[in-house]
Curated annotation (Swiss-Prot):
Cited CDD domains: AAI_LTSS (cd00010)
MF GO annotations: lipid binding
Entry function: Lipid-transfer proteins that possesses lipid-binding activity in vitro. Involved in the development of lipidic orbicules/Ubisch bodies and pollen exine during anther development. May be regulated by the transcription factor UDT1 in developing anthers and play a role in tapetum development. Positively regulated by the transcription factor TDR in developing anthers and may play a role in tapetum programmed cell death (PCD).
Pfam family, one: LTP_2
Cross-referenced InterPro entries: Bifun_inhib/LTP/seed_sf (IPR036312), Bifunc_inhib/LTP/seed_store (IPR016140), LTSS (IPR043325)
Cellular component terms per the entry's GO annotation: extracellular space
Record organism: Oryza sativa subsp. japonica (Rice)
Keywords: Disulfide bond, Glycoprotein, Lipid-binding, Secreted, Signal
Signal peptide: 1-27
Protein name: Non-specific lipid-transfer protein C6
Protein family (similarity comment): Belongs to the plant LTP family.
GO biological process terms on file: pollen exine formation
Disulfide pattern: 32-74, 42-58, 59-102, 72-127
Record localization: Secreted; Secreted, Extracellular space
Length: 132
């Protein structure tokens, strides 16, 4: 049986996390991949457009991002994450999940922060420098 698209996307997130960690602690700390890995449980919600309940662990992961590195939500707003993992993540659905399903409040200025290229958004991941 072939893996589901959600499983494959979670695998891609895991690969990105490992790649960031391979760049050393500094690389992992300056990227959003570790934070966004917390979204893995939410992938079925994005895949099933009729879903009204968050999968187990999804809201806890979102809460961790909102409280820790909310600026990493810009990778959803700017569609960087969906291009990286190949799963459609509509911004309106993501914020409905945050507010209506998980009862979380993203920072009020998150959209303008994301639109401002100088907003200090860490990259999704970074590639380690080649060894000499």
């Amino acid at each position: 049986m072939a893996p589901s698209k959600s499983t494959a996307a979670a695998g891609v997130l895991l690969v990105l996390l490992v790649a960031a960690a391979g760049g050393g602690a500094e690389a992992a700390a300056t990227t959003c991949v570790a934070s966004l890995l917390e979204l893995s449980p939410c992938l079925p919600f994005f895949k099933d457009k009729a879903a009204t309940a968050a999968p187990e662990g999804c809201c806890a992961g979102l809460s961790s991002i909102v409280k820790g590195e909310a600026v990493c939500l810009c990778h959803i707003v700017n569609h960087t994450l969906e291009r990286a993992i190949g799963v459609d993540i509509p911004v309106d659905r993501a914020f409905a999940l945050l507010r209506d399903v998980c009862r979380l409040s993203p920072p009020a200025d998150i959209i303008s922060t994301c639109a401002n290229e100088k907003g200090g958004v860490p990259p999704l991941y970074s590639c380690p420098a080649p060894s000499a």
